[in-house]
Amino acid sequence: MQTQEEASNPLERNIELSVSREKVEAEVGQRLKRLAPKIKIQGFRPGKVPMKIVAQQYGHQIEHEVLGELLQQQFSESINRENYRIAGVPNFESRNPGTDNSNYEFRATFEIYPNIELGDLNSITINKPVLQIGDVEIQKTLEVLRKQRTNYESVDRPAQTGDRVNINYQGSLDGKNFAGGQADNYSVILGNGHLLEDFEASILGMSTGQEKTFDMTFPEDYSGKEVAGKKVTFTITLNKVEAPKLPDVDGEFAKSLGIEDGNVEKMQSEIKANLQRETTQRIRVKLKEQVMQSLLDKISVDIPKILVQQEIDRLIEEVQDTRTARGFPKASNLQRDTFLERAERRVRLGLILSRLIETHGLGVKPEQIKSFIEEHAQSYENPEQVIKWHFASPERIKEIEPLVLEDNAVSWILDRANIVDQNVTFDELMGYSHAANT
């Protein structure tokens, strides 16, 4: 046996393997003898088929099976002697098929897992977001919730931003109708970004019953190719103007949020609890993101190409499953290269985390699984039902284990990291406009 390392890929190895022809032939002969009494061939009594005919009928198939088994056995012995940890499946290339009474010769090509040196992980600095939920955050959330429950009332004044208007419109391109260029009783809220800027500007200031004709040019990148970049004439009739009216924060409003007795203070307490839970979860995500990036920055590791390709397969499958779940057909033109960077990051991080977990004994404990499920169930309307649903299936429990392992690794790093508190607002923490669910 000879082992070679490929210069272009530090994780690729080649092993030259030789399988004894005599050993193959001897095992094939034994199996044919065991098989002969069991086969039935027309013209011969059971168990009386000549061995020559048995060999003609089944010899090639059995030789293939025996050769495969002996080759795999020799390969396993070879990699065990070298203490290789194989990544993926090896590729066997026939170098000599054994047709001239010589031994069977093969070359096995495969990749191995890298040796990962974790180094000093005690010098990592992590910025921890700090936020206390108070009246400001609660009032902002109440405003969002009020806007989500906006009512509209008819008004006798010109249309302005924030109003809901009902219009008829008729568009023409060179005097002819075009697809999507006309509608009756179309309702839209002005200022929410659903209309082209020039089209909306023409509606602003119009009054109920007013008709207006104007020209506008569609953007060059407009999705409707027929009118993209072209000048179009529109005639609009304004049927109705409705002004927004926010609900009062009272008992009825509290009931609309699920507070059965309409207690406003209880509603505010629940909003605060939800914001605190959302804040805790988001801080945890932020810390985890920093820990993962720090590990990638500090630890250099070669990654097996075959694992990257397998990860790309998984990413593509995730995309297709998401499309199917949303009612869209599977994409037929996904380019593997577009997933390469993300796949490499996942594989590299996975190898580092596995090494960290193995080195420091950060395995999953049953009580951690239970705690993880109970905590995440709190964001659902019926936590107890969610908890029972998870524990009813060993497969679901198995899916949670990698998440808990990640949490264990993150906690281990955070216990040793230099934590720097960083005061933030709720909006800064969430990274988007203030919102909350109740």
UniProtKB/Swiss-Prot annotation:
<dbReference type="GO" id="GO:0044183">
    <property type="term" value="F:protein folding chaperone"/>
</dbReference>
<dbReference type="InterPro" id="IPR005215">
    <property type="entry name" value="Trig_fac"/>
</dbReference>
<comment type="similarity">
    <text>Belongs to the FKBP-type PPIase family. Tig subfamily.</text>
</comment>
<dbReference type="GO" id="GO:0043022">
    <property type="term" value="F:ribosome binding"/>
</dbReference>
<dbReference type="GO" id="GO:0015031">
    <property type="term" value="P:protein transport"/>
</dbReference>
<keyword id="KW-0697">Rotamase</keyword>
<dbReference type="Pfam" id="PF00254">
    <property type="entry name" value="FKBP_C"/>
</dbReference>
<keyword id="KW-0131">Cell cycle</keyword>
<dbReference type="InterPro" id="IPR008880">
    <property type="entry name" value="Trigger_fac_C"/>
</dbReference>
<keyword id="KW-0413">Isomerase</keyword>
<dbReference type="InterPro" id="IPR001179">
    <property type="entry name" value="PPIase_FKBP_dom"/>
</dbReference>
<dbReference type="InterPro" id="IPR046357">
    <property type="entry name" value="PPIase_dom_sf"/>
</dbReference>
<comment type="function">
    <text>Involved in protein export. Acts as a chaperone by maintaining the newly synthesized protein in an open conformation. Functions as a peptidyl-prolyl cis-trans isomerase.</text>
</comment>
<keyword id="KW-0143">Chaperone</keyword>
<dbReference type="GO" id="GO:0051083">
    <property type="term" value="P:'de novo' cotranslational protein folding"/>
</dbReference>
<dbReference type="InterPro" id="IPR008881">
    <property type="entry name" value="Trigger_fac_ribosome-bd_bac"/>
</dbReference>
<dbReference type="Pfam" id="PF05697">
    <property type="entry name" value="Trigger_N"/>
</dbReference>
<dbReference type="InterPro" id="IPR036611">
    <property type="entry name" value="Trigger_fac_ribosome-bd_sf"/>
</dbReference>
<keyword id="KW-0963">Cytoplasm</keyword>
<protein>
    <recommendedName>
        <fullName>Trigger factor</fullName>
        <ecNumber>5.2.1.8</ecNumber>
    </recommendedName>
</protein>
<dbReference type="GO" id="GO:0043335">
    <property type="term" value="P:protein unfolding"/>
</dbReference>
<dbReference type="GO" id="GO:0061077">
    <property type="term" value="P:chaperone-mediated protein folding"/>
</dbReference>
<dbReference type="GO" id="GO:0051301">
    <property type="term" value="P:cell division"/>
</dbReference>
<feature type="domain" description="PPIase FKBP-type">
    <location>
        <begin position="162"/>
        <end position="247"/>
    </location>
</feature>
<keyword id="KW-0132">Cell division</keyword>
<dbReference type="Pfam" id="PF05698">
    <property type="entry name" value="Trigger_C"/>
</dbReference>
<dbReference type="InterPro" id="IPR027304">
    <property type="entry name" value="Trigger_fact/SurA_dom_sf"/>
</dbReference>
<dbReference type="InterPro" id="IPR037041">
    <property type="entry name" value="Trigger_fac_C_sf"/>
</dbReference>
<dbReference type="GO" id="GO:0003755">
    <property type="term" value="F:peptidyl-prolyl cis-trans isomerase activity"/>
</dbReference>
<dbReference type="GO" id="GO:0005737">
    <property type="term" value="C:cytoplasm"/>
</dbReference>
